C-alpha cells in the first residue's frame, strides 16, 4: 500500500524504517510537501545558527548538533546516528569510525594544502554523504556542513545548482549523477555542480 508521506519520490531518497517513521514529531504532517516544508524551516534556522557563531565544522559534536538543529523540530532521532542498514552508506557500526577518519583526512588536506578550499569542501561533502550517518537528511546536512567548511577556509558558500535539491527534478538528478561520479573517483562533476 502506498503512503503519500513516506513513499520515496525518486530512487536516491533514503527510505525510513517503521521505527524511524514513528519519530515524526508534528502530528499535523500527513503529506510529503508538509514534511518538506517543516524540515525546510528547521534547516533555515540551523543555517542562521551555524553561520552566526564561531564553530569548528571538523568536530563530530558540531556535526551532530548541526543535524539536530536542522531536523530536531521534526524528528525525535535528529542528531543521532542511524542504527540500521541502508541502501547507501557504511554499516551502522562503522559510522563513528568512518566519520572520525573523514575529519582527520580533511584536517590533513587543509594543513598540507592538498586541495583548494572548494575541493576540500566538496570532497568532505561527498564522503559525509557516503558515510550516511543519520536516518535521513544526510545530503542536506552534508551540503550545509560543506558550505560552513568552505567559509571557514576563506571561500564563498557553495551554490549547489541554485535549486531545491529535495524535489525530484532535473537539478536533483544532476546532483545525484555528480555524487555517483564521485563514488567512481571522478570528483570533477560534483565540484562543477557545487559552483553552478
What do the PLM-derived regions correspond to, one by one?
Residues 1-196:
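FIC/Doc superfamily catalytic core
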Amino acid at each position: 500500500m502506498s503512503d503519500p508521506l513516506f513513499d520515496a519520490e525518486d530512487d536516491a531518497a533514503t527510505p525510513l524504517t517503521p521505527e524511524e517513521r514513528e519519530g515524526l514529531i508534528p502530528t499535523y504532517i500527513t503529506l510529503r510537501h508538509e514534511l518538506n516544508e517543516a524540515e525546510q524551516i528547521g534547516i533555515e534556522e540551523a543555517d542562521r545558527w551555524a553561520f552566526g557563531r564561531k564553530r569548528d565544522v571538523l568536530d563530530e559534536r558540531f556535526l551532530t548538533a548541526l543535524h539536530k538543529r536542522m531536523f530536531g523540530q521534526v524528528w525525535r532521532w535528529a542528531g543521532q546516528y542511524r542504527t540500521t542498514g541502508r541502501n547507501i552508506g557504511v554499516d551502522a557500526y562503522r559510522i563513528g569510525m568512518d566519520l572520525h577518519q573523514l575529519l582527520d583526512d580533511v584536517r590533513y588536506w587543509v594543513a598540507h594544502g592538498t586541495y583548494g578550499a572548494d575541493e576540500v569542501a566538496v570532497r568532505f561533502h561527498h564522503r559525509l554523504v557516503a558515510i550516511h550517518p543519520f536516518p535521513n537528511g544526510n545530503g542536506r546536512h552534508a551540503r550545509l556542513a560543506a558550505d560552513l567548511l568552505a567559509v571557514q577556509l576563506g571561500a564563498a558558500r557553495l551554490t549547489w545548482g541554485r535549486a531545491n535539491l529535495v524535489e525530484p527534478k532535473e537539478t536533483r538528478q544532476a546532483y545525484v549523477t555528480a555524487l555517483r561520479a564521485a563514488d567512481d573517483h571522478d570528483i570533477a562533476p560534483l565540484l562543477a555542480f557545487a559552483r553552478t
